[in-house]
């Protein structure tokens, strides 16, 4: 059973500092989607079955110079649109993918491909869902071996 409370119930109606500022709390939730290939190349996604790092990589997913943009994986896109519909979102008809530039060791290209919102203004159990996106998963930094695995 899931119990929910309003802010008033949780604070016993006390006039708190948070209440006087009309605080809203947001969560960013990342959910891996199961597809046969990565979102922006044809590399397989069976990396959970592979123990060796960096065997499921190519010039496209590592962002090598001269590589042209690759279309988004339709299987992954369909999964995320289905999720947005389940969350009662309005679905955007056009899909735009942008590059968010970061200087992290788990992003060999120096950018992460992420969509503009695919779904907006949804709700689940009276909890507002602002927007739903799809984005590529960066590599996984392994602290034990001091290496990055780009199989993801």
Annotate each language-model stretch with its function:
Residues 2-152:
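Basic, nucleic-acid-interacting segments
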């Amino acid at each position: 059973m899931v119990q929910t409370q309003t802010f008033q119930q949780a604070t016993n109606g006390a006039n708190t500092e948070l209440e006087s500022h009309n605080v809203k709390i947001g969560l960013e939730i990342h959910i891996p989607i199961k597809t046969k290939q990565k979102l922006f190349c044809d590399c397989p996604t069976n990396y959970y079955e592979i123990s060796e790092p960096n065997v499921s990589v190519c010039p496209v997913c590592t962002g090598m110079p001269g590589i042209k943009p690759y279309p988004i994986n339709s299987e992954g896109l369909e999964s995320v649109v289905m999720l947005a519909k389940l969350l009662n979102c309005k679905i955007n008809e056009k899909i735009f993918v942008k590059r968010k530039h970061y200087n992290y060791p788990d992003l060999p290209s120096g950018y992460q491909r992420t969509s503009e919102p695919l779904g907006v203004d949804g709700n689940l159990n009276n909890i507002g869902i602002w927007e739903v996106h799809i984005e590529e998963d960066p590599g996984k930094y392994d602290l034990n071996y001091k290496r990055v695995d780009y199989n993801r």
